[in-house]
């Protein structure tokens, strides 16, 4: 199984620990960054993870930022992604079994590393239960998706990053 993973600069260490855990369990990890602590932007990495999952390059995705809120919002903008921001086992299992979530999000500064790893392992092993009710819920979720032609542009974030480099945005 291939698992895509991405994070922002705030939780690079946590992402690397999760990546190492997944590799120790025999999973192939596709690491979409970031790879250091240089200030960066979580939407970039959420988008990359989401695209890898939707394209079939990865089977599942894991997104981590400080609280998990930002990167999870970003990955959920990729059409075809159903990501759940979780902090507990119950939410993660519900997301996979009932809503067929294909990405799971965490706040690396909110949820401990060992718990994150336990939740991910349970999420991987959980199976979607395709009941009529669950299918209808997923169809309703998919119905509100919007497709933005600009999302497919490889330079989607270029203007934003150039402005950042010029000092037009600040933390």
UniProtKB/Swiss-Prot annotation:
MF GO annotations: galactose-6-phosphate isomerase activity; ribose-5-phosphate isomerase activity
Organism domain of life: Bacteria
Pfam families to which the protein is assigned, alphabetical: LacAB_rpiB
S-S bridge residues: none
InterPro entries: LacB (IPR004784), RpiB_LacA_LacB (IPR003500), RpiB_LacA_LacB_sf (IPR036569)
Enzyme class: isomerase
EC number: 5.3.1.26
Keywords: Isomerase, Lactose metabolism
Pathway listed: Carbohydrate metabolism; D-galactose 6-phosphate degradation; D-tagatose 6-phosphate from D-galactose 6-phosphate: step 1/1
GO biological process: D-allose catabolic process; galactose catabolic process; lactose catabolic process via tagatose-6-phosphate; pentose-phosphate shunt, non-oxidative branch
Catalyzed chemical reaction(s): aldehydo-D-galactose 6-phosphate = keto-D-tagatose 6-phosphate
The family this protein is said to belong to: Belongs to the LacAB/RpiB family.
Protein name (record): Galactose-6-phosphate isomerase subunit LacB
Species this protein is from: Streptococcus sanguinis (strain SK36)
């Amino acid at each position: 199984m291939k698992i895509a993973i991405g994070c922002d600069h705030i939780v690079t260490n946590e992402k690397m620990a999760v990546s190492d855990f997944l590799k120790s369990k025999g999973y192939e990890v596709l690491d979409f960054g970031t790879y250091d602590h240089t200030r960066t932007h979580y939407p970039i990495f959420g988008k990359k993870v989401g695209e890898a999952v939707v394209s079939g390059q990865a089977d599942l995705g894991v997104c981590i930022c400080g609280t998990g809120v930002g990167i999870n919002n970003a990955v959920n903008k990729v059409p075809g992604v159903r990501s759940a921001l979780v902090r507990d086992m119950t939410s993660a299992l519900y997301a996979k079994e009932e809503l067929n979530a294909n990405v799971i999000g965490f706040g690396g500064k909110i949820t401990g590393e060992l718990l994150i790893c336990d939740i991910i392992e349970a999420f991987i092993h959980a199976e979607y239960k395709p009941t009529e009710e669950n299918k209808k819920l997923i169809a309703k979720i998919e119905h509100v998706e919007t497709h933005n032609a600009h999302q497919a542009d490889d330079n989607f974030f270029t203007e934003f990053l150039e402005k950042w480099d010029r000092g037009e945005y600040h933390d």
